[in-house]
Amino acid sequence: MAVQKNKKSRSKRGMRRSHDSLSTPQLSVDSTSGELHLRHNVTADGFYRGQKVINK
């Protein structure tokens, strides 16, 4: 098992943990259907930026 030789400071611990935070997903409203969707993703209806891109 790995054991550290010297104690890590609070500053170094904080620097390591600075990338661990979670961010909320960026949502957009489609101009055609008014549906919420993730940014840069096609809606469930097949619309992207107001245009139909997927035909079911």
UniProtKB/Swiss-Prot annotation:
Residue stretches of biased makeup (Basic residues): 1-16
GO cellular component: large ribosomal subunit
GO molecular function: structural constituent of ribosome
GO biological process: translation
Listed Polar residues bias regions: 21-34
Residue ranges of the region described as Disordered: 1-36
Domain of life of the organism encoding this protein: Bacteria
NCBIfam families: rpmF_bact (TIGR01031)
Family to which the UniProt record says this protein belongs: Belongs to the bacterial ribosomal protein bL32 family.
PANTHER family for the chain: 50S RIBOSOMAL PROTEIN L32, LARGE RIBOSOMAL SUBUNIT PROTEIN BL32
Protein's name according to its UniProt entry: Large ribosomal subunit protein bL32
Organism of origin: Shewanella sediminis (strain HAW-EB3)
Gene: rpmF
